[in-house]
Design a protein with these regions (language model features):
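A short, structured loop/turn motif at beta-sheet edges
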Residues: 19-20, 67-74, 97-106
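Short beta-strand segments that buttress and anchor functional surface loops
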Residues: 50-55, 77-82, 111
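Hydrophobic/aromatic beta-strand elements that line small-molecule binding cavities or substrate pockets
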Residues: 13, 63-68, 92-99
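Beta-strand/loop substructures that line and gate deep hydrophobic ligand-binding cavities in soluble
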Residues: 85-129
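Hydrophobic ligand-binding cavity/cleft-lining segments
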Residues: 1-41
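A conserved amphipathic terminal alpha-helix motif
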Residues: 4, 113-157
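Hydrophobic pocket/interface hotspot
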Residues: 22, 32, 50, 66, ...
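Short beta-edge strand/loop motif at the mouth of beta-sheet-based domains
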Residues: 10-11, 30-65, 72-74, 149-157
Length: 157
């Protein structure tokens, strides 16, 4: 990220599951596809490339590098448009932290190095809550949410 004004997005949720199940849901493409529609593909080793692959046509939407991988507690990756993969200055950073608390897990996602006011920052603020709500539903009920559905008509009062 360049020296332009930066911002970050932080989202915390509590999921009635284990850190291992959340880790698998994030890192195994066949599970990620269920709640994210797309899949995350990598060997998840430090220094490896990861790709966010569309479930419908297999095209790579996003790509980055694995910075830190401590299964099942912490994953840090860079994040950028697939075309920008070679240019690390255009990458943002995502940190996923999993902390067991009794019979649940506190999952905190911090997406930083975002350019303040950018389309990416806006997209992130809209996207992460949808993805993580669907992940929570899948792990707690066995069914993901269709968080990308359009709202039904509202009644004007």
């Amino acid at each position: 990220m360049t020296s332009e004004a930066a911002t970050k997005f932080v989202y915390t949720t509590y999921i009635s599951t284990t850190p291992e199940k959340i880790w698998q849901a994030i890192t195994r493409p066949e599970i990620a596809r269920q709640y994210w529609v797309h899949q995350n593909v990598s060997d998840w080793k430090v220094g490896s490339k990861w790709e966010h692959v569309r479930g419908d046509d297999g095209s790579v939407m996003l790509a980055g590098k694995v910075i830190e991988s401590v299964s099942p507690r912490k994953l840090v990756i860079t994040w950028g448009e697939a075309a920008d993969y070679p240019n690390e200055a255009k990458h943002t950073r995502v940190t996923l932290e999993l902390e067991p608390i009794g019979e649940m897990v506190r999952l905190t996602v911090t997406h930083d190095d975002l350019k303040a006011g950018s389309d990416m920052a806006s997209s992130i603020a809209n996207g992460w809550p949808r993805v993580l709500s669907s992940l929570k539903s899948l792990l707690e009920t066995g069914k993901p949410l269709d968080t990308w559905a359009q709202p039904k008509g509202r009644i004007n009062q």
